[in-house]
């Protein structure tokens, strides 16, 4: 499972192993289940209607712990990213791992993935660019903010020291995922613009994107501060500190250096920033 993580997300392949077990395994599995949905949504070689049907198949598979409804899916070898091809081919083994989790843990993952899939489907049906900042914010919530909520539910369930701060953490939880989503959009903005693949309407400027990312990162900072204040389990703090550091550095690069990519030095600095945790 962790080899799939390395093939599909360089940043989470670093941060998820920082978590303690058993939550480490569950977060890794949940990430990959969400990543399957992301891959379906992003696969432009399928029509929006076909992708919508596949998303329904996938959430049914997660709910029932059976891949019977996905057996008719097409070959994904045309996907240019080999890691995503491997992920799609591994969906049966992912569902088998999910089946081994306690029922409440399976239900939690399904609950949040169902919310994300419903949001993805809503935007697939529209099949149009985001018309304003409100729509962009809503999209980011469904595809990333919900992940932050799921992670927070996992953290507070695992580490009872966080229970007194649960309401405050859940209020800020969407920012944990949205900050990463927004800096990914910033990172890809230049390339997408060059390839004429932008999904923004003219009503959304690059400055709007920077402003949303800045706001989200400030909320993620508050989230991290609460983890420190309540002396959360060190691995949970390290996971969040690493992801926050990467997002913050990517935003700083975009604002001050005029480029959007993170290189190995950025990842190394993010790792060094949490070694004291």
Q: Model segments located where?
A:
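Catalytic cores of Mg2+-dependent Asp-rich isoprenoid enzymes
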Residues: 1-180, 186-277
């Amino acid at each position: 499972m962790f080899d799939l993580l390395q093939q599909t997300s360089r940043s989470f392949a670093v941060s998820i192993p920082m978590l303690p077990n058993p939550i480490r395994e569950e977060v890794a599995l949940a990430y990959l289940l969400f990543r399957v949905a992301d891959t379906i949504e992003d696969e432009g070689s399928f029509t929006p209607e076909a992708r919508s049907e596949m998303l329904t198949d996938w959430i049914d598979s997660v709910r029932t712990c059976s891949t019977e409804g996905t057996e008719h899916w097409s070959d994904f070898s045309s996907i240019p990213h080999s890691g995503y091809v491997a992920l799609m081919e591994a969906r049966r083994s992912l569902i088998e791992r999910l089946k081994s989790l306690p029922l409440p843990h399976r239900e939690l993952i399904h609950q949040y993935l169902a919310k994300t899939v419903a949001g993805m489907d809503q935007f697939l049906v529209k099949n149009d660019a985001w018309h304003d900042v409100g729509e962009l914010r809503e999209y980011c919530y469904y595809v990333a903010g919900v992940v932050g909520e799921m992670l927070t539910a996992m953290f507070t369930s695992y580490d009872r020291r966080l229970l007194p701060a649960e309401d405050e953490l859940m209020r800020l939880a969407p920012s944990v995922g949205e900050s990463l989503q927004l800096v990914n959009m910033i990172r890809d903005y230049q390339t997408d613009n060059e390839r004429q693949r932008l999904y923004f309407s003219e009503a959304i400027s690059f400055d709007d994107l920077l402003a949303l990312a800045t706001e989200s990162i400030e909320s993620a900072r508050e989230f991290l501060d609460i983890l420190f204040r309540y002396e959360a389990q060190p691995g949970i703090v390290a996971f969040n500190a690493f992801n926050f550091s990467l997002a913050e550095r990517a935003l700083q690069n975009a604002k001050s250096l005029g480029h959007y990519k993170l290189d190995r030095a950025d990842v190394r600095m993010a790792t060094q920033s949490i070694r004291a945790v």
